[in-house]
């Protein structure tokens, strides 16, 4: 069938958008859907149709009912000096955003930390989680169920690990509420973010549990104790994805000459804004100035699951005055990133990861994803430092007026 024939059928409602993939090659199907939509809504979509993506490469992998692609400006910051266990050296970091002044802000923070010797970064924990919820008729059955899980842990581990070459079950943590039990499974997932990997593994385990402990009714493979795409205490306390810490000691001359401030003032603002202000506002774990800005921009650029910004931007900014220098650290308990799979395979996202030398599987497995996590945490620290400094000297509004609105200031 020709494209124009498919377009006509779409406009008449004789076929649905998803059925086009059965009639045309993937790229032709994308064109047909877009042309039909243009006729249906009466709007031309030439920009959406202009893309470098080969849709035959992402069919049944990244999106459905595709009509084109959205483009977001991509900027670069750096070089930032990172002294991590996996990221060692100077790195340029790609950031995709439509927020004027963000990239310039982060870049000034990077200049300050690099002139002060760079950022030290460490991945303290690395595990992706999934937590199915089991329903019981009575709490009488729960102690035996927990004992069953403990006694069959190795068998469960073998079942889970058999579903993937890279997924390795590390632990199972039970949580009980009434006649409900959540089992929070934690996995190593190599260089993948690992959400699909652990879901497939846990589904197999749940089949085994229901077959061998019939009173356990697995209602859902995800019971929200995982906790995916939500700001939760369980992620802040136990971690999800990478738990990363980064620190730097900013020299007094750098604070004065680059940031136009002083250590005591930046520290005071951090305590009153990021800690007292956040506590008074009632946030669970967002004790920071703008982690979300930096993490989101890097997530978009590198093909991460952007919805996971909810938990990936949770974290804490800590400062101390040391003489006239400023100690600053950031802690991200649930940074969920990968360098293989998902959106990382898209051509522009692949190139963005390659800028930092982290595309694909690392050697050993998992090292590239941890390297990326250390780079992100170091960039987040730089963004926090600069924003706190900008607040201390009343530069925030001027920066956004100049770079966000193109106003003369």
Swiss-Prot record:
InterPro entries: HMG_CoA_Rdtase, HMG_CoA_Rdtase_cat_sf, HMG_CoA_Rdtase_CS, HMG_CoA_Rdtase_eu_arc, HMG_CoA_Rdtase_NAD(P)-bd_sf, HMG_CoA_Rdtase_sub-bd_dom_sf. It catalyses: (R)-mevalonate + 2 NADP(+) + CoA = (3S)-3-hydroxy-3-methylglutaryl-CoA + 2 NADPH + 2 H(+). Optimum temperature is 85 degrees Celsius. Stable at 90 degrees Celsius. This is 3-hydroxy-3-methylglutaryl-coenzyme A reductase. Keywords: Isoprene biosynthesis, NADP, Oxidoreductase. Pfam families: HMG-CoA_red. Converts HMG-CoA to mevalonate. The gene is hmgA. NCBIfam families: HMG_CoA_R_NADP. The lineage of its organism: Archaea, Thermoproteota, Thermoprotei, Sulfolobales, Sulfolobaceae. Optimum pH is 5.5. CDD domains: HMG-CoA_reductase_classI.
């Amino acid at each position: 069938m020709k494209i124009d024939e498919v377009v006509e059928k779409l406009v008449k409602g004789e076929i649905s958008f998803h059925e086009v993939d059965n009639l045309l090659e993937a790229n032709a199907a994308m064109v047909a859907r877009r042309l039909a939509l243009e006729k249906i809504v009466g709007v031309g979509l030439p920009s959406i149709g202009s893309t470098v993506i080969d849709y035959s490469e992402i069919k049944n992998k990244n999106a459905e009912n595709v009509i084109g692609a959205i483009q977001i400006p991509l900027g670069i910051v750096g070089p930032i000096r990172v002294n991590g266990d996996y990221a060692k050296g100077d790195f340029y970091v790609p950031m995709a955003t439509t927020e004027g002044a963000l990239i310039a802000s982060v870049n000034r923070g990077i200049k300050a930390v690099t002139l002060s010797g760079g950022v030290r970064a460490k991945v303290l924990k690395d595990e992706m989680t999934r937590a199915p919820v089991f329903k019981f008729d009575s709490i009488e059955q729960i102690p035996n169920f927990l004992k069953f899980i403990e006694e069959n842990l190795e068998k469960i581990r073998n079942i889970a690990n058999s579903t993937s070459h890279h997924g390795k079950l590390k632990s199972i943590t039970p949580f009980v509420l009434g006649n409900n039990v959540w089992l929070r499974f934690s996995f190593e997932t190599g260089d993948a973010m690992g959400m699909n990997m652990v879901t497939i593994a846990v589904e197999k385990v749940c089949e085994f549990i229901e077959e061998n402990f019939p009173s356990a009714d697995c209602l859902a493979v995800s019971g929200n104790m995982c906790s995916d795409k939500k700001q939760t205490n369980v992620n802040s306390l136990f971690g999800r994805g990478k738990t990363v810490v980064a620190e730097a000691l900013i020299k007094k001359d750098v604070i004065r000459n680059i940031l136009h401030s002083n250590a005591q003032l930046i520290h005071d603002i951090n305590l009153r804004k990021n800690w007292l202000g956040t506590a008074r506002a009632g946030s669970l774990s967002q004790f920071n100035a703008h982690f979300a800005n930096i993490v989101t921009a890097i997530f978009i650029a590198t093909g991460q699951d952007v919805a996971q910004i909810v938990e990936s931007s949770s974290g804490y900014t800590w400062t101390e005055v040391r003489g006239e220098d400023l100690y600053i650290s950031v802690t991200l308990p649930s940074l969920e990133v990968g360098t293989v799979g998902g959106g990382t395979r898209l051509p522009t996202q692949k190139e963005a990861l390659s800028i930092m030398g982290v595309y694909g599987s690392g050697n050993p497995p998992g090292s590239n994803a941890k390297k990326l996590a250390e780079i992100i945490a170091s960039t987040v620290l730089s963004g926090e430092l600069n924003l706190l400094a900008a607040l201390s000297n009343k530069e925030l509004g001027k920066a956004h007026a100049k770079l966000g609105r193109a106003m003369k200031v």
